[in-house]
Regions:
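Conserved ABC ATPase "signature" region
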Residues: 19-26, 118, 122, 129-147
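Conserved ABC ATPase signature
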Residues: 151-155
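ABC ATPase "signature
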Residues: 236-237
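Catalytic Walker B motif of ABC-type/P-loop ATPase nucleotide-binding domains
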Residues: 176-179
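A short, surface-exposed alpha-helical micro-motif characterized by mixed small hydrophobic
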Residues: 218-220
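Helical segment within the ABC ATPase nucleotide-binding domain
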Residues: 191-203
Length: 262
């Protein structure tokens, strides 16, 4: 179970006006401003749920995921995931989570996919029997057999994303964080990724938290959405709670953003 209660996160960033004189002045006298990325964020996600965590750019989605994965520490509030505080019990915590970023890679670009998998086996200290079992299962489910000996840089985007998902699941995590997992993929690759995620959730009861701007992904994969804007939770419910009188989810979401001035 994932529980966040009254979490706040603020970033201190330097500010200056454009121009050489302002840049020179900033060398001797820096001015700062504070950006409130998360403001009193609270929610609970039960085991096996598939949740869409959505909002416009700069809403606080990435900050939330980084706190949940143990990368960031909030100034206020509490976060408990399966009995662990992510940033305090990070080594133990990362054994139970998988993270996929659509625009970043955890694979090594100049070596075959299999070499990256072998290295991840050592990083996560996966036993050989468990590793072989998971690799065989993931290779079959994601159709990776012809890709394992190929250097990552030679893969298409769709092929690489399937390998990224497999890499994040080799250690059999209980929770999977997906950040734009289908960005840039063609229609066939998108369907393959969606089908796999649904099958994973059904067969292993894996908790899935999906952040994306692709509402087709949200509609196909999740039964609950949490909508964040300007660092605050604006809605926690279903797609129907937003859509109501609109023909499409995108149209309804745009109207929702306008009504909340975000």
């Amino acid at each position: 179970m994932i529980t966040m209660q009254h979490v706040r996160k603020t970033y201190k960033v330097s500010k200056r006006d454009a121009g050489f004189s302002s840049a020179f002045k900033a060398l001797f006298h820096k001015e700062y401003e504070y950006i409130h990325a998360l403001d009193d964020v609270s929610f609970t996600i039960c085991d096996g749920e598939m949740v869409g965590y959505i909002g416009p750019n700069g809403a606080g989605k990435s900050s939330t995921i980084k706190i949940l994965s143990g990368i960031l520490t909030p100034e206020e509030g509490t976060c408990l995931i399966n009995g662990l505080i992510p940033w305090k019990n990070r080594i133990e915590h990362v054994k139970n989570i998988g993270v996929v970023f659509g625009q970043r890679s955890q694979l090594w670009w100049d070596v075959p996919v299999m070499d990256s998998f072998e290295l991840l086996k050592e990083i996560y200290k996966i036993s050989t029997p468990s590793y072989n079992h998971n690799l065989e299962q993931l290779t079959d489910m994601l159709n990776l057999s012809e890709l394992l000996k190929t250097p990552v840089r030679q893969l298409s985007l769709g092929q690489r994303m399937r390998c990224e998902i497999a890499a994040s699941l080799l250690h059999d995590p209980k929770i999977l964080f997906l950040d734009e997992p289908t960005i840039g993929l063609d229609a066939v690759s998108k369907l393959a990724v969606r089908d796999f995620i649904l099958k994973l959730n059904k067969e292993k009861n894996t908790t899935v938290i999906l952040t994306t701007h692709d509402m087709q992904d949200i509609e196909a994969l999740t039964n609950r959405i949490i909508l964040i804007g300007k660092g605050s939770i604006l809605l926690d419910g279903t797609i129907d709670d937003i859509r109501k009188d609109y023909d499409s989810t995108e149209e309804a979401l745009a109207a929702f953003y306008r009504s909340h001035n975000i």
